[in-house]
């Protein structure tokens, strides 16, 4: 199967260059699809600066014209936001629009709607609009997303193409993502859509990265100190292959099976926290009071 994967060495080099400067000051609030947890959306608005803060909605991943206006309406009606702008980027050429770029650069909260994550990357990566989001995030803006708007946030992004009934090498199509959620590969709808096969396949081939599977109705709140907290109704799964012995064997009908010994998996619930730098579970906020 053809894999549209940028060289991993390029991704790691880019991450190293980014890491050489000051780390981003922004937070991430990333939802795994399904219903958007009220607590997660309120946290997004709070981190943006409150209901009066400028918020930009990017419906780029969606094929529906209603997605952007509906998300704007939710921010206004449910969370009292008064300065919400839909930035309707659908084509790459629109990412060069000066008005759109100015709106994104001035936003304190930027929210990516769901749909097809490949559309976000095609339209925005390496453009003035994409750069404006990155600059705003580095300066302290909160970036949020749901479903595809979550999947696009890691340095490598699962596109959704592949045979997910097996755990095999070279089986999952990856693209370079936006790279705001560093050190991981994030996968939404994780428990609801039984996506463990594809995330395990990817992490066994990229043990330097953590797999973070975010279930529906659930979010991760990623902080500038490289920790995250679980918000919502279900689970967040962390897959860690740093100490795993990876094995390979021929697969029936071609291909290559991939296996691992001592693969570490954490199943986290609401309120539990994780340190991405040390790859360890932290006490829940309620346990430290």
Indicate residue ranges for each PLM-predicted region:
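Bacterial N-terminal signal peptides
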Residues: 7-16
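Positively charged n-region of N-terminal signal peptides that target proteins for export
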Residues: 1-4
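A short, aliphatic-rich alpha-helical micro-motif
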Residues: 104-105, 137
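Catalytic nucleophile loop
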Residues: 112-114, 133-157
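C-terminal and late-domain segments of enzyme folds
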Residues: 21-51, 62-69, 75-79, 157-159, ...
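ATP/NTP phosphate-donor binding region
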Residues: 45, 53-103
């Amino acid at each position: 199967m053809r894999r549209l994967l940028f060289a991993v060495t390029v991704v790691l080099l880019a991450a190293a260059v980014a890491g050489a400067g000051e780390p981003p000051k922004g937070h991430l609030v990333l939802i795994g699809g399904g219903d958007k947890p009220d607590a997660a959306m309120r946290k997004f608005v709070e981190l943006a600066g409150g209901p009066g803060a400028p918020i930009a909605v990017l419906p780029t991943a969606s094929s529906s014209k209603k997605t952007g206006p509906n998300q704007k309406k939710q921010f206004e009606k449910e969370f009292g936001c008064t300065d919400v702008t839909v930035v309707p980027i659908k084509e790459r050429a629109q990412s060069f629009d000066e008005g759109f770029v100015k709106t994104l650069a001035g936003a304190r909260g930027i929210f990516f709607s769901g749909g097809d994550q490949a559309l976000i990357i095609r339209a925005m990566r390496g453009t003035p609009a994409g750069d404006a989001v990155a600059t705003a995030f580095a300066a302290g803006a909160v970036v949020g997303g749901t479903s595809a708007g979550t999947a696009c946030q890691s340095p490598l992004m699962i596109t959704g193409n592949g045979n997910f009934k097996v755990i095999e090498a070279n089986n999952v199509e990856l693209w370079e993502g936006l790279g705001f959620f560093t050190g991981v590969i994030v996968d939404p709808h994780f428990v609801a859509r039984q996506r463990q096969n594809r995330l395990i396949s990817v992490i066994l081939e990229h043990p330097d990265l953590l797999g973070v599977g975010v279930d529906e109705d659930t979010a991760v709140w990623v902080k500038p100190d490289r920790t995250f907290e679980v918000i919502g109704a279900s689970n967040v799964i962390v897959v860690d292959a740093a100490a795993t012995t990876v094995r390979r064997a021929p697969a029936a009908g071609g291909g290559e099976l991939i296996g691992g010994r001592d693969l570490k998996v954490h199943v986290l619930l609401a309120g539990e926290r994780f340190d991405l730098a040390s790859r360890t579970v932290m006490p829940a906020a309620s346990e430290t009071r």
